[in-house]
């Protein structure tokens, strides 16, 4: 079992943790989040970005992690970036808690997400369904108020 965690911080009040667990390279990765400080009753883009570099805030994390050269999509789409986790849905206090199993996100193997950055966006991810070029790159999810590098944990 490999475990990793990202502690999210940023310019705004958004923060929290994202935990990753994977049994073997062929197994799905369980992703569990506990995020606070978002707008109430909102959907916010949730992605893994390429670089574990936050020297210039969350913008240094680069584009979505996309080792297979696919277009942006929903987590259930075959055509999606590895880093496309969709949207977090917040409650009436702006908090989001949840868990999902993802077949594309890996902690083990050549396309591991360890050392990359989890980003919470300020807008809703259109899941690649917007009718413009940016939708197929970013989902039009907007600015990056919080992020954290994915590190190995015990």
Swiss-Prot record:
GO CC annotations, alphabetized: cytosol; mitochondrial intermembrane space; nucleus; superoxide dismutase complex
Cofactors required: Cu cation; Zn(2+)
Predominant cellular place of this UniProt entry's protein: cytoplasm
Compartments, record wording: Cytoplasm
UniProt entry tagged with the keyword DNA-binding: no
UniProt: substrate binding residues: 144
One GO MF term attached to the UniProt entry: superoxide dismutase activity
Biological processes per GO annotation: cell redox homeostasis; copper ion transport; fungal-type cell wall organization; intracellular copper ion homeostasis; intracellular zinc ion homeostasis; negative regulation of cellular respiration; positive regulation of transcription by RNA polymerase II; protein stabilization
Matches recorded under InterPro entries: SOD-like_Cu/Zn_dom_sf (IPR036423), SOD_Cu/Zn_/chaperone (IPR024134), SOD_Cu/Zn_BS (IPR018152), SOD_Cu_Zn_dom (IPR001424)
Reaction(s) this enzyme catalyzes, per UniProt: 2 superoxide + 2 H(+) = H2O2 + O2
Disulfide feature: 58-147
EC number(s) reported in the record: 1.15.1.1
Cofactor: binding comment: Binds 1 copper ion per subunit. Binds 1 zinc ion per subunit.
Family: Belongs to the Cu-Zn superoxide dismutase family.
Cited function: Destroys radicals which are normally produced within the cells and which are toxic to biological systems.
Subunit organization: Homodimer.
Name this protein carries in UniProt: Superoxide dismutase [Cu-Zn]
Organism for this UniProt entry: Claviceps purpurea (strain 20.1)
Species lineage: Eukaryota, Fungi, Dikarya, Ascomycota, Pezizomycotina
């Amino acid at each position: 079992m490999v475990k990793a965690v990202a502690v999210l911080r940023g310019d705004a009040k958004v923060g929290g943790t994202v935990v990753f667990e994977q049994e073997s390279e062929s197994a799905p990765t369980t992703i569990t989040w506990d995020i606070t400080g978002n707008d109430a009753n909102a959907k916010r883009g949730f992605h893994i970005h390429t670089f574990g570099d936050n020297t210039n805030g969350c913008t240094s994390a680069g584009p979505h992690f996309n080792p297979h050269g696919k277009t942006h999509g929903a987590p259930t789409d075959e055509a999606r970036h590895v880093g496309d986790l969709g949207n977090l849905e917040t409650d009436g206090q702006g908090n989001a808690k949840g868990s999902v199993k993802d077949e594309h996100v890996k902690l083990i193997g050549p396309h591991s997400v360890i050392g990359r950055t989890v980003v919470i966006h300020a807008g809703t991810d259109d899941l690649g369904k917007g009718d413009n070029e940016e939708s197929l790159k970013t989902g039009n999810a907007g600015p990056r108020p919080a992020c954290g590098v994915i590190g190995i944990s015990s």
